Amino acid sequence: MSNFGASDLEAVLEVADVPPVINQIQFSPFEFRRTLLQACERRGVALEAYSPLGTGRHLRDRQVARIAERLGRTPAQVLIRWSLQRDVVVLPKSTHRERIEQNAHVFDFALTHEDMAALDGLDRTGGTDHALERPWW
């Protein structure tokens, strides 16, 4: 599935002979859709973060940069690691070999509870998935 909100997910699960295994949405600390993440966790549906780097705009955030500098990591690595620590599948996009290699080096460090909380605070959705709801269906 792609861009299904929590209510859409429930509607599909009510009628599906074969339940979905993954839901791909835009997901990052800036689009931290807690309600949908929790719904997917409860129902055994993996969440896949599309555009976890926000087409680059999130890489310039001051909070992300401070954490990255303290850890000796890139802002992209910090954002990818945040999703991984939430058990979210991450699909960062890059066409540059160096960045692709950097993006893969995120399994040898962890963000602290304080780092995770600071990044959670960047959310602009209020934790909801209203932007994903489809009232016209």
Predicted feature residues:
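Beta/alpha (TIM)-barrel catalytic core signal, keyed to glycine-rich beta->alpha loops juxtaposed to Asp/Glu
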Residues: 1-137
